[in-house]
């Protein structure tokens, strides 16, 4: 798939995934989450939870997301773990608390497979423009 950014075409993967947010004691609210990956940022996956005041964007490690399909993974504000029913739990923490989400593991596995077609796991470092990174770092 191709992403459009500022009118220019950029190689990348962007898919919509249904996720469910724990909204109360035992009720779940469906969210339409856009999962995006760009080879220019090969270690990161972007989860976009929509626009407006209630919207949020999280950048997750692609490696952590993949590991969370197989077993508990994550540290700090992000934790991911598979469930016995074929879903994946994602806990995102921040100053306002923790959001607990669930989504079908198959949807995330297909998304990650598409990212691996663009940048195979383990080859991410070869996609980084290190000169540009150093230049940006030194200009801070």
For the regions a protein language model found, what residue spans apply to each?
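Short, surface-exposed linear segments at secondary-structure transitions and domain or protein termini
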Residues: 65-76, 108-115
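A short, structured beta-strand/loop element
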Residues: 44-46, 73-92
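Mixed-charge, glycine-accented linear interaction segment located at domain edges/termini
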Residues: 94-140
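Protein-protein interaction regions
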Residues: 14, 23-26, 49, 57, ...
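Short, surface-exposed coil-to-beta transition loops
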Residues: 30-31, 74-76, 98
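Short beta-strand segments
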Residues: 56-58, 88, 97-101
């Amino acid at each position: 798939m191709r992403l459009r950014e500022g009118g220019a075409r950029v190689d990348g993967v962007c898919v919509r995934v249904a996720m469910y947010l724990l909204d109360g004691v035992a009720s779940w609210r469906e969210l339409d989450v856009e999962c995006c990956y760009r080879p220019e940022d090969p270690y990161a996956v972007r989860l976009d939870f929509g626009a407006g005041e209630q919207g949020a964007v999280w950048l997750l490690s692609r490696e952590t997301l993949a590991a969370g399909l197989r077993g508990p993974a994550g540290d700090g504000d992000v934790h991911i773990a598979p469930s016995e029913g074929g879903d994946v739990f994602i806990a995102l923490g921040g100053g306002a608390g923790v959001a607990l989400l669930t989504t079908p593991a198959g949807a995330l596995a297909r998304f990650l497979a598409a990212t691996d077609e663009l940048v195979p796991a383990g080859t991410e470092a070869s996609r980084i423009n290190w000169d540009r990174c150093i230049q940006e770092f030194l200009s801070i």
